A protein has these predicted regions:
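N-terminal targeting signals for export/organelle localization
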Residues: 4-6, 13-101
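Thiol/selenol-based redox catalytic cores and closely related redox-interacting motifs
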Residues: 46-47, 57-61, 65-87, 162-237
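Short active-site neighborhood of thiol/selenol oxidoreductases, capturing the structured segment around
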Residues: 114-135, 150-153
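Loop/turn elements at helix/coil->beta-strand transitions in domains of secreted/extracellular proteins
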Residues: 119-122, 147-152, 178-181, 216
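Residue-level recognition of beta-strand->loop/alpha-helix junctions
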Residues: 155-157
């Protein structure tokens, strides 16, 4: 969903109210704008409003999304704030923090997990059973585990609801042994069974959409960073070490 046209409409709606107030008085009106936005966005339950590194701007975290709003309530800014002195993408750091906060509230039981004997890093993979590079990643699952990388799979059928890939994901996540079923599905083998009403495929897919994921595999690191595409085991380990 494209949230920013909606934000612009909301700001136009409230502009006659917020433009006449001082910074402190504007907080209530800014909250009204953001509360309305929460009702529109899927998977968004709350927001945080903080002073940004730029004077006169609030930083707003809505899930993993980051926007900026002027303290007088007149201006909405979408984009990246770069700290040139320290070579840091301030906005992406805030996004990463938001992703981690969202993931902390997610039950691991909804995922399919491959765990090493000793975990040094944890990654969450948004995967599509019919994606070629997702299958390539899974073919090497033991190599990732040998490097101490815990792999948590979430379902993200790229073709969307009511498609063959979506149905395959439902069969896998509804099976008695999800890992075995996923192994079979990733090998192109048929997985039969019943589709359970409480399967997490839709909620996983919606979360991926909130994170603006469009391709698979997408790797979410334990620092909240997104890596789009396949990485071989050693390359992924190197990226994870660099983040630390």
């Amino acid at each position: 969903m494209q949230i920013f046209p909606l934000l612009a409409l909301l700001l136009l709606f409230y502009s006659d109210v917020v433009s006449s107030n001082q910074d402190e008085d504007n907080l209530q009106e800014i909250d009204a704008v953001l509360q309305t936005l929460l009702e529109i966005l899927p998977g968004a339950n709350d927001y945080t409003l903080d002073d940004s590194v730029v004077e006169g701007l609030y930083s707003v975290n809505i899930g993993s999304e980051v926007i900026y709003i002027s303290k007088d309530g007149k201006f909405l800014i979408r984009g990246e704030i770069l700290d040139l002195e320290n070579s840091i993408n301030v906005t992406e750091e805030k996004r990463s923090q938001g992703r981690l906060e969202v993931m902390e509230n997610l039950d691991e039981k909804t995922m399919i997990i491959y765990e090493p004997k000793k975990t040094t890093h944890t990654v969450t993979i948004f995967t599509d059973i019919d994606c070629g590079y997702c299958r390539k990643f899974h073919e090497q699952i033991d190599d990732y585990l040998d490097l101490g990388i815990k792999v948590r799979y979430m379902s993200f059928p790229r073709t969307g609801p009511n498609t063959e890939s979506w149905e395959k994901a439902q069969y896998v996540w509804c099976s008695k042994d999800r890992s075995i079923s996923l192994d079979r599905a990733k090998q192109g083998k048929k997985v039969d069974g019943d589709i359970c009403l409480d399967n997490p495929v839709e909620s996983h897919y919606n979360l991926g959409s909130v994170f603006n994921i469009s391709g698979t595999p997408t790797i979410l690191t334990d620092k909240g960073k997104l890596i789009v595409g396949y990485l071989p085991p050693q390359s992924l380990l190197l990226r994870l070490k660099e983040e630390n």
